[in-house]
């Protein structure tokens, strides 16, 4: 059993109290640039923890031990889906920080999307998927996605459907 916790950083103002129940779509805070931030934005984290101990979840080294990719926890924008998957080397090990090319995301326009990157040492896949990467808000359509593994380019053809998750795996 896992407890799911979310954290929201850089808020200019909180609109709810700690422990208050909220409804889907209810604003809980206003984005800001508090803390170590250079512009207004929301830093959102999802923690899938085997404990409900807040000190164990947050951690003391600024890298919470149960952080997962929040893109798999948020409903995609209308007309878009989610692409998630795994990238393996020839020995069956995850390839860390590999760039997965070929996907597009129309938002945000001010910071164009160019590639997904597989997780590094400190990021974990979600408990349900154990994915190595995930990208939300990908417009529905056909894509050829690719990654380089051990110097070899590997491609896969995928179809993204609105509101659904598309799974893809890469091996040399």
Residue ranges and their predicted role:
Residues 149-172:
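Structured interaction patches on ligand/partner-binding surfaces of diverse proteins
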Residues 8, 135-136, 158, 170:
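Hydrophobic core positions of the immunoglobulin-like beta-sandwich fold
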Residues 17, 45-130, 139:
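Acidic, glycine-rich catalytic/binding loops that coordinate metals and/or anionic ligands
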Residues 2-25:
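Short histidine-centered loop motifs in beta-beta connectors
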Residues 139-151:
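A short, solvent-exposed beta-strand micro-motif common in secreted/extracellular proteins
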Residues 23-35:
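Short hydrophobic beta/alpha edge segments that flank linear recognition/processing sites
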Residues 1-5, 37, 62:
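Gly/Ser-enriched beta-turn/beta-hairpin loop segments
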